[in-house]
Curated annotation (Swiss-Prot):
Keyword line: Cytoplasm, Nucleus, Protein transport, Transport
Lineage: Eukaryota, Fungi, Dikarya, Ascomycota, Pezizomycotina
Species, as recorded: Aspergillus oryzae (strain ATCC 42149 / RIB 40)
Keyword Glycoprotein: no
Main location: cytoplasm
UniProt region (Disordered), positions on chain: 1-27
Name used for this protein in its record: Protein bcp1
Compartments, as annotated in UniProt: Cytoplasm; Nucleus
Pfam hit, one: BCCIP
């Protein structure tokens, strides 16, 4: 498989408010730092950084999986996938994206655990029935499991180049007869919903009127690109984590807001020929304003 060239993107705006959101344009709102981002192939030096990002991706359920083994699998295919760094090749990755062939690695313990976990979670959400059916097959189909995560303050604009390079690398791998001809892609992500603060509930002050039990809970995205990607999926849905956070966890993420947040997993299944169109729309959505 041909080696991808290292690329560099200058002056990406990092931090502050999203420039696409209407609002006051005061100096207080415009906290912008220009940062040079560099894209690299996964390397052994990234091992611990990848583990940290993988734990962040799987949240409270990260303890279920052997994250060291999963990191090693990512590093074992160095010409597929990317990391994003800001302080040169020797620094820790601030973001990563890769794909793993579930069929090719089905006998490896960490992939067995992942397939079993994803199948159970998909079967618990009717919206994910097509995914549950695929993961129940023996052997599992050639599904490309896309894993991607970034530090919380990383701009979404670093994501499209990673997907673009991944699609190129997969095409090169297929030309070289490597096992990356996928029938589907499955992206693991996260979202969150707002919940009533436990601290406020214990307070004696009058409370805001609660939503009726039948009201639909609004979903928010940690990764804004997920809102675009979902439109191109065969199916998508949220999953509850097996290991629950303690009751005070949502308040610890409240940050001066009236409501806390509860995180959920998110699964997005694509027919293989639909992902490229999703990536193209995502690029347009995340294109920095002129």
């Amino acid at each position: 498989m041909g080696k991808r060239k290292e690329i560099k993107d200058n002056d990406v705006e990092m931090g502050g408010t999203d420039p696409r959101v209407d609002g006051d344009e005061s100096d207080e709102d415009m906290d912008i730092v220009n940062v040079d981002f560099e894209w690299f192939d996964p390397q052994p030096i990234d091992f611990h950084g990848l583990k940290i990002l993988l734990r962040q991706l799987f949240d409270s359920d990260a303890q279920i999986f052997d994250m060291s083994a999963l990191s090693d699998m990512i590093l074992a295919q160095p010409l597929l996938g990317s990391t994003v760094k800001v302080d040169g090749n020797e620094s820790d990755p601030y973001a990563f994206l890769t794909v793993l062939n579930l069929q090719e690695h089905k006998d490896k313990p960490v992939i067995k655990d992942l397939i079993s976990y994803l199948q159970r979670k998909a079967s618990s959400n009717p919206d994910l029935a097509p995914l549950s059916q695929l993961l129940s097959q023996t052997p599992v189909p050639p599904i490309g499991l896309i894993l991607t995560e970034r530090l919380i303050n990383m701009p979404a604009e670093v994501v499209p180049p990673m997907y673009t390079m991944l699609m190129e690398e997969i095409a090169w791998a297929i030309q070289d007869k490597e096992p990356y001809k996928f029938s589907h892609y499955l992206i693991v992500s996260k979202n969150y919903e707002e919940v009533q603060s436990k601290l406020d509930m214990e307070d004696s002050r009058p409370q805001k009127k609660k939503k009726k039990s039948g009201d639909k809970v609004e979903k928010f995205y940690f990764h804004p690109e997920d809102e675009i990607l979902e439109k191109h999926t065969r199916c998508f849905g949220s999953i509850e984590y097996t290991h629950k956070h303690d009751e005070g966890h949502s308040d610890s993420k409240r940050a001066f807001q009236e409501l806390g947040i509860r995180t959920n997993g998110s699964l997005m299944l694509f027919d293989a020929d639909k992902l490229e169109g999703a990536i193209n729309e995502m690029k347009e959505f995340l294109q920095p304003p002129v």
